[in-house]
Amino acid sequence: MGTNLSVPNPLGFFPDHQLDPAFKANSDNPDWDLNPHKDNWPDSNKVGVGAFGPGFTPPHGGLLGWSPQAQGILTTVPTAPPPASTNRQLGRKPTPLSPPLRDTHPQAMQWNSTTFHQTLQDPRVRALYFPAGGSSSGTVNPVQNTASSISSILSTTGDPVPNMENIASGLLGPLLVLQAGFFSLTKILTIPLSLDSWWTSLNFLGETPVCLGQNSQSQISSHSPTCCPPICPGYRWMCLRRFIIFLCILLLCLIFLLVLLDYQGMLPVCPLIPGSSTTSTGPCKTCTTPAQGTSMFPSCCCTKPTDGNCTCIPIPSSWAFAKYLWEWASVRFSWLSLLVPFVQWFVGLSPTVWLSVIWMMWFWGPSLYNILSPFMPLLPIFFCLWVYI
């Protein structure tokens, strides 16, 4: 540093530049802060603490001398406040005066006492400001309900938002039906598999059922006769067994439904009187409403004259049941009436044609089943959508 006795203080370690180079107490050297050739560091004017912190000085004096700053005595120099002129410039400025109402809201000046009085005569406005029976002119007039007045005023803005709870409850029913339908379908499909396993086990009493088609020219692995692949010769026999099982299950369901409807009196089949012809006159059941009407009951087998007796035409229960199902389906699905000519033509075919159809189903049935099997779960979905929508 040469002859410059001013020591720079970049880190603020030395207190206020009161360091004596010769470590002489009470030296006559001038205050180094008054030296015009000193280094002006940012922390040069800050008052520091003693060598060992405030309030702790060794008995023989500190390393920095006996000056007050070296002994850890802090002196605070009051700072003069800024002038009053700059105090307003740095702080919040005063709020200016508000302009008059006639300049900011000219439309409010149009509401004079006459216009306001005429507006209050509107019953919708009166219902908002005056209670029932109240009046500004002293006349007691009936006042509409406030809710109805508000709704009438707001009716021009558009329809209210639909209630989402009603929409959610309307969709919950079909979703539950679809879930129950899929669950029932999975359980129903396990019934034919169980019956097929029982059927094939009759040919292998005490042995493990094995498909006999694996010994043919087709190189396939050993498998059960209830799980034949399409290339196995026993695949068509498996389809035939399952088709017969499905027909038996359907027949049992129809018989159960027929017994239930007959027990409830929904199939009024007129019995034959012994020793009479196909038609008889006598007491008969009351004729029910046909399926084309408001009820789902089938047509009665007899006509009822005015004298209380009716002419009964005996028909079998199965025919009455089939007629009932056809009329119910025709009422629900109007397009079934277009199939009547085709069904009549199909029924009138010769036995040769029927055998040909059975043979085609036997030959092409497995291939069609592989094509249509992915779409089978969609049938209950379409049925539920048709019924509920």
Curated annotation (Swiss-Prot):
Explain the post-translational modification: Isoform M is N-terminally acetylated by host at a ratio of 90%, and N-glycosylated by host at the pre-S2 region.
**Which protein, by its recorded name, is this?**
Large envelope protein
| Name of the gene this protein is made from | S
In this chain, the stretch annotated as Pre-S2 covers 109-163
Pre-S: annotated segments: 2-163
Q: Which Pfam families match?
A: vMSA
Q: According to the UniProt record, where is the region Pre-S1? A: 2-108
Role played: The large envelope protein exists in two topological conformations, one which is termed 'external' or Le-HBsAg and the other 'internal' or Li-HBsAg. In its external conformation the protein attaches the virus to cell receptors and thereby initiating infection. This interaction determines the species specificity and liver tropism. This attachment induces virion internalization predominantly through caveolin-mediated endocytosis. The large envelope protein also assures fusion between virion membrane and endosomal membrane. The middle envelope protein plays an important role in the budding of the virion. It is involved in the induction of budding in a nucleocapsid independent way. In this process the majority of envelope proteins bud to form subviral lipoprotein particles of 22 nm of diameter that do not contain a nucleocapsid.
> In the UniProt entry, what is the domain comment?
The large envelope protein is synthesized with the pre-S region at the cytosolic side of the endoplasmic reticulum and, hence will be within the virion after budding. Therefore the pre-S region is not N-glycosylated. Later a post-translational translocation of N-terminal pre-S and TM1 domains occur in about 50% of proteins at the virion surface. These molecules change their topology by an unknown mechanism, resulting in exposure of pre-S region at virion surface.
Query: Does this UniProt record's set of keywords contain Ligase?
Result: no
Lineage of origin: Viruses, Riboviria, Pararnavirae, Artverviricota, Revtraviricetes
One example of a Gene Ontology biological process annotation: fusion of virus membrane with host endosome membrane
Q: Which family does the similarity line name?
A: Belongs to the orthohepadnavirus major surface antigen family.
Question: Which regions face the Intravirion side of the membrane?
Answer: 2-242, 192-242, 359-364
Question: According to the UniProt topology, which residue ranges lie Virion surface?
Answer: 2-170, 264-337, 388-389
User: What keywords does the record list, in alphabetical order?
Assistant: Acetylation, Caveolin-mediated endocytosis of virus by host, Fusion of virus membrane with host endosomal membrane, Fusion of virus membrane with host membrane, Glycoprotein, Host-virus interaction, Lipoprotein, Membrane, Myristate, Transmembrane, Transmembrane helix, Viral attachment to host cell, Viral envelope protein, Viral penetration into host cytoplasm, Virion, Virus endocytosis by host, Virus entry into host cell
| CC terms in the record's Gene Ontology section | membrane; viral envelope; virion membrane
Q: Which residues are glycosylated?
A: N309
Instruction: Output the HAMAP family linked to this UniProt entry.
Output: HBV_HBSAG
Biotechnological applications listed in the UniProt record? Systematic vaccination of individuals at risk of exposure to the virus has been the main method of controlling the morbidity and mortality associated with hepatitis B. The first hepatitis B vaccine was manufactured by the purification and inactivation of HBsAg obtained from the plasma of chronic hepatitis B virus carriers. The vaccine is now produced by recombinant DNA techniques and expression of the S isoform in yeast cells. The pre-S region do not seem to induce strong enough antigenic response.
Lipidation feature positions (N-myristoyl glycine): G2
Location, primary (coarse class): virion
InterPro entries documented for this protein: HBV_HBSAG
Subcellular location(s) of the protein = Virion membrane
**Entry's transmembrane regions:** 171-191, 243-263, 338-358, 365-387
Q: How does it assemble?
A: Interacts (via its myristoylated pre-S1 region) with the host SLC10A1/NTCP; this interaction is essential for viral entry.
